[in-house]
From Swiss-Prot:
It is found in: Membrane. Keywords: Membrane, Transmembrane, Transmembrane helix, Transport. One of its GO terms (cellular component) is membrane. It comes from Danio rerio. This is Solute carrier family 49 member A3.
Length: 474
């Protein structure tokens, strides 16, 4: 690229000429890493965080939102459920956009959807908006944000594969993926504070629209290329080499990927249930909403910290399967402990510790699992392999939520601090949740085996020394 200087690494030729199908790729072929990859990663992190905040804007203040929007509580819940619906409905189109039209188109398009949705939500609560139209306008804005979510959620593996060298891919994936979790944490903390301070939704929605607008501006003006001028690694040049529909068919014939799809997707579904039902499970045993929020926040913080450490480790060791299997086993143990401790009153310290372990081993393995999906399916599109797993998790989450709520029975516990007529006995549901988690972990540990196809392809085509510097972008 003109105007750019770069420190590059020579591509070491294979001993067999047949291994090099392109005769023009001679010893002059080189790999380059560009400093702008960190800018694109930062934009994706901000966009992912902003979209997660939009998703969970109303859930922590559902009661106040129902009053201020003049609607019922079930309608307020749909402001969050629309994200789950959009993730399932738009998953295949989002995968196609990422793997066919490219990363730049996906990030700019999703940033505009997210920003327009956030701004439309603000317009919905303005005083000039008729009362009968308030909820409809807010829901339209929320739907636009929801349509952006699959493009944002599926992007980290694509960005890591295209722009980052092999020793930084898991870390880049972790940073982009965990930004979504940080957004959920911020929404849990900020929504109650802002609404209690202002007494309305205008200030809340206005503040949440700022990071969305900034991400849109940065993506539109700052991202100029879908791929780097020179590949960052041997595998990035073959990313998404298969047509989309042909890639889907190949995925469905991959036994190891099916196991990962179902077992890892089950883990995503379990954690969605945990986050959604935590307050309802704890209130019946006398734990306040504030304490439930602390438990949720602790699990997220520990998960982010664990993801950072695990990503650094697998970037260097490449032990994706070992890390996944160990963490899934420890997650099932933590889930079983939560099923027992959550049914005991006056065990605050122990409950926080269990939630800490649950988040540490469960949340932290998400970026590693997404990288493992790419290793299992290379050279198929990264967005397709990771996107199908996320979609599987959303579908299983919906099924588990319906099952667990059906198993919960009304109760009249003397320790309950739940709202009137909402106390439920969650003993059987949490045991079922722990059982599902344990079964998924056992199946994954026993039956999942795969070769690291992307690493093998890179080893076959080149031996790349660790870059000594980044390209200086013009």
């Amino acid at each position: 690229m003109e105007g750019e200087s770069a420190e590059t690494e020579p591509l070491i030729q294979s001993s067999s000429a047949a291994d090099r199908p392109d005769p023009a790729a001679e010893a002059a072929a080189r790999f380059t890493v560009y400093r702008r990859r960190w800018f694109i990663l930062s934009v994706l992190c901000l966009l992912n965080c902003s979209n997660a905040m939009a998703w969970l804007t109303f859930a922590p203040v559902a009661g106040q939102s129902a009053q201020l929007l003049c609607v019922s509580l079930p309608l307020v819940n749909w402001l969050s459920l629309v994200f789950v619906l959009a993730a399932v409905v738009c998953s295949f189109s989002s995968m196609w956009v990422l793997d066919t039209l490219g990363l730049r188109c996906s990030l700019i398009g999703s940033s505009w959807l997210n920003a327009c949705g956030c701004v439309l939500r603000v317009c919905g609560v303005l005083s000039v908006t008729p009362q009968w139209a308030v909820f409809a306008v807010v829901m339209c804005g929320q739907t636009l944000c929801a349509l952006a979510q699959p493009l944002v959620i599926f992007a980290p593996t694509k960005l890591a594969a295209l722009w980052f060298p092999d020793h930084q891919r898991a870390t880049a994936n972790m940073l982009a993926s965990m930004a979504n979790t940080v957004g959920l944490l911020l929404a849990n903390l900020l929504s109650p504070l802002i609404v209690s301070y202002s007494g309305d939704l205008f200030l809340l929605l206005l503040i949440y629209s700022i990071p969305a607008a900034v991400a849109c501006l940065l993506a539109t003006l700052g991202i100029h290329q879908a791929v780097p001028p020179t590949p960052a690694s041997a595998s990035s040049s073959s990313s998404a080499s298969e047509p989309f529909l042909q890639g889907i068919r190949q995925l469905l014939r991959n036994r190891a990927y099916w196991i990962l799809l179902l077992c890892f997707g089950s883990g995503i579904g379990i954690f969605t249930c945990f986050s959604t039902l935590l307050e309802q499970i704890l209130c019946v045993k006398g734990y306040s909403n504030g304490f439930a929020g602390v438990c949720g926040a602790v699990s997220i913080v520990c998960g982010v910290a664990g993801a950072f450490l695990l990503s650094l480790y697998v970037d260097r060791s490449k032990k994706f399967m070992e890390v996944m299997k160990i963490c899934m086993c420890l997650t099932s143990v933590s889930c079983s402990a939560f099923a027992v401790v959550s049914q005991l009153p006056a065990q605050s310290v122990l409950l926080v510790l269990v939630c800490c372990c649950f988040g540490l081993f469960g949340y932290s393995v998400y970026p590693v699992g997404m990288e493992l999906s790419v290793e299992t399916t290379h050279p198929l599109g990264e967005a397709t392999s990771a996107g199908l797993i996320f979609t599987s998790g959303q579908i299983q989450a919906a099924l588990y939520l319906l099952l667990l709520q059906a198993l919960a029975t009304p109760t009249h516990s003397p320790t309950s601090v739940c709202a009137a007529d909402t106390s439920l006995n969650w003993t059987v549901p949490v045991l079922v949740m722990a059982g599902v988690c344990a079964i998924s972990s056992c199946v994954f540990v026993v039956f999942f085996h795969t070769e690291y196809r992307r690493l093998r392809a890179e080893a076959d085509s080149a031996t790349e020394p660790e870059p000594t510097g980044d390209a200086a972008d013009a």
